């Protein structure tokens, strides 16, 4: 056992962040901590790292256990070199009698710094290399031998190379197990899937305020759905019992005999339990912020077309001879290391910068472009939240309808009492929601999203994805959130930072190109790629093969059989014996999921065959 939290609680002002939370960390554990913004994840991490103290409960750790904490934001002294930053936190000598300089050299080598980088100013490093330097400082502070590493939002502002390095660093095997146990707060779903061996979600949706699942994020999603479904069924069953109690009580108890008193007490207890479980179910099904981007509803085939564009700054070539077209339904992802030219390409496409060669052709009238930038508009720290949301008056016009600032704020999960509070009191996620609220007020033909995921929690990320899927215009997306790129991008432009680029149909192919100088050639012409629920191929009608026609002839019978299986599975979940047995209920839920998936697959295949036939 490396660390144990026993029934710890913490409040912020009058609001309870979490109550009586318990957690145990053993060697080899890699624990991902998730939850909505404001749930207290970072506070919990600081308590585990002994940076803060809990209001109640205790943290137990053997004295021999060494742990290090890597905060979200780094702080290096002004003018410090890479080596200076690490030496500043290294012990004079470690257990092996190594001096500070040697300890620092080992730390820097371990995180990938070459010797010719040691004298670089820390202030000149990219986000990914600053994270490596923070990690080197943490390792150095304990003589390079931590048992436990705690990280707060470690992938924020990292490029894909930095994220890949961090994943390798945390999962590196030594002696058959991970080199370090780790606990990390993150909203990066792919990172959670690649690294975590256990997921902990802090939320009011669960008894005790926490749900723990062994396995990665994909396993967590499955188990969480089972839990929420089971809790909903439990509420229904309990509500039936309470109704029976009410009928019995309405008849009037004859006296107050011991047996009747017990029944009354049991009824009261059931009502309390029902109230609690309904509150948890409400928390579990909260939809979060209501994100809907507005479009001009223009159906122009091509909104922006780049023909042979190139751009360089001095000898630094960013892209050359690039052809790219943006039309309704397109979502083009831009991928490359920090400094490879993604932001510059956006500026050229949107007319803010002129290309060195080639031309940009726009639709007539010019497309309306709305930009969500990672370098977001700064509000004065004293600006009240209400003014930040509605800068002109106490009302906004959204899709032709006037809304009061109170209603508009609630749409983004802000409480009424927050409207008069300064924006300086908001968390990073709350500020991100303010900026989303601002750009939702502008109707767009083209949405440009430059790192929109920073500071957003997973529920808001998923809502943002849904809204972008439904947006009828074109989208340019710059993000290191691999899950979002995979779900949304119809094409991905890969910039290698040397003036070359390639257009890929999938994220996996784009990552392979980034990771290899000898990657296979990918066609660089601007060919739209089919993306489910986003765009359809513009190919002409296709004649069905004999095999496809046979499949189409028999698919309706298969669909009817699949729907009957779904109905049977639904009926099984209403069986009292199943509801009373967790194992049977889990199996029944799995059968239902599989039946629904098969039905959905057959309907999708039917649509596909009919489209090919027409």
Task: Name what the model sees in each region.
Residues 285:
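Short, surface-exposed loop/strand segments
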Residues 1-233, 288, 293-614:
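ABC ATP-binding cassette signature C-motif
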Residues 223-256, 260-266, 270-281:
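Intracellular alpha-helical coupling/juxtamembrane segments of multi-pass membrane proteins
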């Amino acid at each position: 056992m490396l660390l144990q939290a026993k029934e710890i609680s913490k409040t912020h002002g009058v609001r309870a962040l979490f109550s009586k939370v318990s957690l145990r960390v053993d060697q080899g554990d890699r624990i991902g901590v998730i939850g909505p913004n404001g749930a207290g994840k970072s506070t919990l991490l600081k308590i585990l790292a002994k940076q803060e103290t809990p209001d109640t409960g205790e943290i137990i750790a053997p004295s021999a256990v060494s742990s290090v904490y890597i905060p979200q934001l780094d702080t290096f002294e002004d003018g410090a070199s890479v080596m200076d930053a690490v030496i500043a936190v290294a012990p004079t000598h470690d257990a092996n009698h190594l001096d500070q300089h040697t300890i620092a050299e080992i730390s820097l080598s371990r995180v990938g710094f070459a010797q010719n980088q040691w004298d670089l100013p820390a202030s000149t490093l990219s986000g990914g290399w600053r994270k490596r330097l923070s990690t080197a400082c943490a390792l150095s502070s304990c003589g390079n031998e931590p048992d436990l590493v705690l990280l707060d939002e470690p992938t924020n502002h990292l490029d894909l190379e930095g994220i890949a390095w961090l994943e390798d660093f945390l999962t590196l095997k030594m002696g058959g197990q991970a080199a370090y146990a780790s606990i990390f707060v993150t909203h990066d779903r792919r990172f959670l899937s690649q690294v975590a061996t256990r997921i902990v979600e802090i939320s009011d949706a669960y008894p005790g305020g926490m749900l723990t699942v062994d396995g990665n994020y994909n396993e967590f999603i499955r188990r969480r759905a089972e839990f929420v479904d089971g809790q909903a069924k439990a509420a229904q069953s309990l509500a039936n019992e309470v109704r029976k109690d009410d009928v019995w009580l309405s008849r009037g108890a004859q006296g107050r005999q011991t047996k009747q008193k017990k029944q009354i007490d049991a009824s009261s207890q059931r009502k309390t339990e029902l109230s609690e479980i309904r509150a948890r179910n409400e928390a579990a099904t909260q939809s979060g912020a209501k994100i809907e981007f507005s479009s001009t509803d223009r159906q122009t085939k091509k909104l922006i077309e780049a023909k042979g564009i190139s751009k360089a700054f001095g000898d630094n070539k960013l892209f050359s001879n690039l052809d790219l077209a943006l039309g309704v339904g397109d979502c083009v992802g831009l991928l490359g290391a920090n400094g490879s030219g993604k932001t510059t390409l956006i500026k050229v496409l949107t007319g803010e910068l002129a290309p060195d060669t080639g031309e940009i052709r726009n639709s007539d009238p010019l497309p309306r472009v709305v930009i969500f930038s990672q370098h977001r508009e700064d509000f004065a720290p004293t600006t009240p939240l209400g003014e930040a949301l509605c800068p002109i008056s106490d009302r906004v016009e959204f899709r032709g309808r006037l809304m009061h600032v109170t209603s508009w704020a609630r749409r983004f999960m802000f409480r009424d009492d927050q409207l008069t509070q300064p924006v300086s009191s908001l968390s990073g996620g709350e500020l991100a929601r303010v900026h989303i609220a601002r750009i939702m007020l502008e109707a767009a033909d083209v949405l440009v999203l430059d790192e929109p995921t920073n500071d957003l929690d997973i529920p808001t990320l998923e809502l943002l994805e849904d809204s972008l899927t439904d947006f009828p215009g074109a989208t340019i997306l710059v993000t290191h959130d691999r899950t979002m790129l995979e779900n949304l991008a119809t094409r991905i432009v890969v910039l290698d930072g040397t003036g070359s680029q390639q257009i890929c149909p999938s994220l996996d192919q784009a990552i392979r190109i980034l990771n290899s100088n000898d990657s296979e050639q990918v066609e660089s012409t601007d060919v739209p790629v089919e993306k489910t629920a986003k765009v359809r191929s513009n190919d002409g009608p296709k004649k069905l093969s004999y095999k496809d026609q046979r499949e189409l002839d028999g698919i309706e019978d298969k669909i009817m059989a699949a729907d009957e299986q779904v109905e049977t599975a639904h009926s099984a979940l209403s069986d009292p014996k199943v509801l009373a047995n967790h194992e049977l209920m889990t199996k029944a839920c799995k059968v239902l999921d599989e039946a629904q998936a098969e039905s959905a697959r057959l309907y999708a295949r039917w649509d596909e065959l009919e489209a090919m036939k027409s």
